[in-house]
Swiss-Prot record:
Function: F(1)F(0) ATP synthase produces ATP from ADP in the presence of a proton or sodium gradient. F-type ATPases consist of two structural domains, F(1) containing the extramembraneous catalytic core and F(0) containing the membrane proton channel, linked together by a central stalk and a peripheral stalk. During catalysis, ATP synthesis in the catalytic domain of F(1) is coupled via a rotary mechanism of the central stalk subunits to proton translocation.
Organism whose genome encodes this protein: Nostoc punctiforme (strain ATCC 29133 / PCC 73102)
Keyword Thylakoid: yes
HAMAP family associated with the record: ATP_synth_b_bprime, ATP_synth_bprime
Protein name: ATP synthase subunit b'
SUPFAM superfamilies, sorted: F1F0 ATP synthase subunit B, membrane domain (SSF81573)
Record NCBIfam families: PRK07353.1 (NF005607)
Cellular component terms per the entry's GO annotation: plasma membrane-derived thylakoid membrane; proton-transporting ATP synthase complex
Family affiliation: Belongs to the ATPase B chain family.
Chain ranges passing through the membrane: 6-26
Length: 143
């Protein structure tokens, strides 16, 4: 069946030589390329994870800053509204005070005019009364 002559060791030597040549020419560069590719993928994956973590951290930080800015703007708006209400209340109080002052002044003027009108009417009544008496009684002799 099998002949064990020089062909078998020669074929074994040829197989080993082919395996060594293929290993040197094909498998080592292929393994190196695969290792480099694996290293590149791992590096990129790690960098991507770091970038994603950094982006998430920045997004959280920006959201916090945005929330702080909203709170500050809300506080500013509320402070402005309170200030506006305070100013409005002061202006209303001032206007009411001025209106009250004008009412009091008008009341005083009306009272003065009333007294003046009564005084004028009294003088006219006295004068008319004397005229009526003179017409009724006649002229009175001067003493």
């Amino acid at each position: 069946m099998f002949d064990f002559d020089a062909t078998l060791p020669f074929m074994a030597l040829q197989f080993l030589l082919l395996a060594a040549v293929l290993n040197a020419i094909f498998y080592k560069p292929l393994t190196k390329v695969l290792d480099d590719r694996d290293s590149y993928i791992r590096t990129n994956t790690l960098e991507a994870r770091e970038s994603l973590a950094k982006a998430e951290r920045l997004a959280t930080e920006y959201e916090q800053q945005l929330a702080d800015a909203r709170r500050q703007s809300q506080a500013t708006v509320e402070a402005a509204q309170l200030e506006a209400k305070k100013i409005t209340a002061e202006k209303i109080a001032e206007a009411q005070k001025e209106a009250q002052s004008q009412r009091e002044q008008a009341s005083v003027e009306i009272e003065q005019q009333k007294q003046q009108a009564f005084s004028t009417l009294e003088q006219q009544v006295d004068a008319l009364s004397r005229q009526i008496l003179e017409k009724l009684l006649g002229p009175t002799p001067v003493r």
